[in-house]
């Protein structure tokens, strides 16, 4: 597709999030490579397979903003629990806290887990979303480090003796599930060569 003409987007991509820490990470990873704005939308909480959830949220968001959107879904999957909590990690964390996440694995020797991040890009209403998936393997440990960003204190990636929360941001962003998924998003944008139209009205 290298000879294909660049597709014009009506406006900059809207990254849908109300999470300041998540937005900070995405900005740090993407830099100026992709022009985007952020917006908090109240999208219904869905159930199902992670990629299906992410795609449906992208469809709904694209309809709401009437333009290109990028949505993110994050999973934390415990291998001993056959992938749970998975996409429902947010609610598990809210209800049980970091100690509760560890307690889920008390009866199991296997503390291994993987973090997964799915970005879905819909170029506009009615457009089929594209997905970009990043995974990082690790294990669940008692909480260490700052407790200001989700489950970062209890996830220690393989090959490191620090949890996500203990790592310098620059290191985490290179090896994290979010960093890997966003690297694929950046590759797609570079290859697709999208052009954002500027009609001067905003």
From Swiss-Prot:
<dbReference type="GO" id="GO:0036222">
    <property type="term" value="F:XTP diphosphatase activity"/>
</dbReference>
<dbReference type="InterPro" id="IPR029001">
    <property type="entry name" value="ITPase-like_fam"/>
</dbReference>
<dbReference type="GO" id="GO:0005737">
    <property type="term" value="C:cytoplasm"/>
</dbReference>
<keyword id="KW-0963">Cytoplasm</keyword>
<dbReference type="GO" id="GO:0009117">
    <property type="term" value="P:nucleotide metabolic process"/>
</dbReference>
<dbReference type="InterPro" id="IPR027502">
    <property type="entry name" value="ITPase"/>
</dbReference>
<dbReference type="Pfam" id="PF01725">
    <property type="entry name" value="Ham1p_like"/>
</dbReference>
<feature type="binding site">
    <location>
        <begin position="73"/>
        <end position="74"/>
    </location>
    <ligand>
        <name>ITP</name>
    </ligand>
</feature>
<feature type="binding site">
    <location>
        <position position="172"/>
    </location>
    <ligand>
        <name>ITP</name>
    </ligand>
</feature>
<comment type="subunit">
    <text>Homodimer.</text>
</comment>
<dbReference type="GO" id="GO:0000166">
    <property type="term" value="F:nucleotide binding"/>
</dbReference>
<keyword id="KW-0479">Metal-binding</keyword>
<comment type="function">
    <text>Pyrophosphatase that hydrolyzes non-canonical purine nucleotides such as inosine triphosphate (ITP), deoxyinosine triphosphate (dITP) or xanthosine 5'-triphosphate (XTP) to their respective monophosphate derivatives. The enzyme does not distinguish between the deoxy- and ribose forms. Probably excludes non-canonical purines from RNA and DNA precursor pools, thus preventing their incorporation into RNA and DNA and avoiding chromosomal lesions.</text>
</comment>
<feature type="binding site">
    <location>
        <begin position="177"/>
        <end position="178"/>
    </location>
    <ligand>
        <name>ITP</name>
    </ligand>
</feature>
<feature type="binding site">
    <location>
        <position position="57"/>
    </location>
    <ligand>
        <name>ITP</name>
    </ligand>
</feature>
<keyword id="KW-0547">Nucleotide-binding</keyword>
<feature type="binding site">
    <location>
        <begin position="149"/>
        <end position="152"/>
    </location>
    <ligand>
        <name>ITP</name>
    </ligand>
</feature>
<feature type="binding site">
    <location>
        <position position="45"/>
    </location>
    <ligand>
        <name>Mg(2+)</name>
    </ligand>
</feature>
<feature type="binding site">
    <location>
        <position position="90"/>
    </location>
    <ligand>
        <name>ITP</name>
    </ligand>
</feature>
<dbReference type="GO" id="GO:0046872">
    <property type="term" value="F:metal ion binding"/>
</dbReference>
<feature type="binding site">
    <location>
        <begin position="17"/>
        <end position="22"/>
    </location>
    <ligand>
        <name>ITP</name>
    </ligand>
</feature>
<protein>
    <recommendedName>
        <fullName>Inosine triphosphate pyrophosphatase</fullName>
        <ecNumber>3.6.1.66</ecNumber>
    </recommendedName>
</protein>
<keyword id="KW-0464">Manganese</keyword>
<keyword id="KW-0460">Magnesium</keyword>
<dbReference type="GO" id="GO:0009204">
    <property type="term" value="P:deoxyribonucleoside triphosphate catabolic process"/>
</dbReference>
<keyword id="KW-0546">Nucleotide metabolism</keyword>
<dbReference type="GO" id="GO:0036220">
    <property type="term" value="F:ITP diphosphatase activity"/>
</dbReference>
<dbReference type="InterPro" id="IPR002637">
    <property type="entry name" value="RdgB/HAM1"/>
</dbReference>
<keyword id="KW-0378">Hydrolase</keyword>
<dbReference type="GO" id="GO:0035870">
    <property type="term" value="F:dITP diphosphatase activity"/>
</dbReference>
<comment type="similarity">
    <text>Belongs to the HAM1 NTPase family.</text>
</comment>
């Amino acid at each position: 597709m290298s000879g294909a003409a660049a597709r014009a987007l009506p406006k900059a991509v809207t990254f849908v999030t109300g999470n300041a820490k998540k937005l900070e990470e995405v900005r740090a990873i993407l830099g100026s490579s992709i022009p985007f704005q952020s917006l908090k939308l109240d999208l219904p909480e869905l159930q199902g397979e992670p990629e299906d959830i992410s795609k449906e949220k992208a469809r709904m968001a694209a309809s709401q903003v009437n333009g290109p959107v990028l949505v993110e879904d994050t999973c934390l999957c415990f291998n001993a629990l056959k992938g749970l909590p998975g996409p429902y990690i947010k609610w598990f964390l809210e209800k049980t806290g970091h100690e509760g996440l560890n307690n889920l694995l008390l009866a199991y020797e296997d503390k291994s887990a993987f973090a997964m991040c799915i970005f879905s890009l819909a170029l506009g209403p009615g457009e089929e979303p594209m997905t970009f998936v990043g995974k990082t393997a690790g294990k669940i440990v008692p909480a260490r480090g700052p407790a200001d960003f989700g489950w970062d204190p209890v996830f220690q990636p393989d090959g490191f003796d620090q949890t996500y929360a203990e790592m310098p941001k620059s290191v985490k962003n290179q090896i994290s599930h979010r960093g890997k998924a966003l690297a694929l998003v950046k590759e797609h944008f570079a290859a697709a060569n999208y052009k954002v139209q500027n009609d001067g009205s905003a």
